[in-house]
Amino acid sequence: AETRNFALRDKKGNEIGVFTGKQPRQAALKAANRGHKDIRLRERGTKKVHIFAGERVKVKKPKGAPAWMPNEIWKPKVKKIGVEKLDEI
């Protein structure tokens, strides 16, 4: 599977950033970790917009984490809401 580019869109449809990942969810997790809540990702080269609800929560660091890692880390969570088809980009 190739790495795909997903353009992050705001409510007006402006593309405000690009996140990469093999799956839309992987890109959505990266967007959520930057603090985006309403995540709309358009796959490059298509008219599909994948819609996710994102959040990030503070969790304790995992067992076996390296010593330099802080005790609490941000963990992104996303929930897929659906896919929209655009008439034009």
Swiss-Prot record:
Biological process according to GO: DNA protection
GO MF terms, alphabetically ordered: DNA binding
Top-level taxon of the source organism: Archaea
Keywords: DNA-binding
Pfam families: MC1
Coiled coil, from the record: none
Record function comment: Protects DNA against thermal denaturation and modulates transcription.
Protein name: Chromosomal protein MC1a
